[in-house]
Amino acid sequence: MPASLAGPPASGPLPLPPPVNYNPALLATAPAMIDGYALLGFDRLAGFPFAPVPFDPATAKPGAPPPSSADQIPATIKRFDHQLAIVTGFMLPTKMEKGLVTEFLLVRSPMMCCYGQVPNMNEWVVVQVPAGVKPLMDIPVSCFGKLHVKEEFDNGYITSIYQLDGEKLTDAKG
């Protein structure tokens, strides 16, 4: 069998290739600050390879914790955990109450939804806005709030590595 068809070596999976926009110098530099908020773009947040460790809770040993993929997140990104940040992207509402969006995915590209390409795990931020905001679809929006850099799981499946406690939302073009 050709080596290319043999699969990964017995020692583990092959390392992930860096993303197209991989820029180690950017990851190492401090972001611009606006009124105490770090300006964090997806060029930085998605600027490293990340792939969740495969795990199927349905076939795992009962009570087994899901494996962590946190070691793939660079320290230069983890340092933004619990920091005030501004992240700009496109709103994809996931929860609404009384006509207002209370939770949404902030995605890198408007093509990363229903009929577009599936984003990488580091190309979205789960934003919680308890008071709710009006839906702003198909235009870039800037979200202000406290960023969390940690794995979130739902029923054993990793669902995000970035979460933001939304304080304010603005139309990025206006």
State what each model feature region is.
Residues 1-174:
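OB-fold and OB-like single-stranded nucleic-acid-recognition modules
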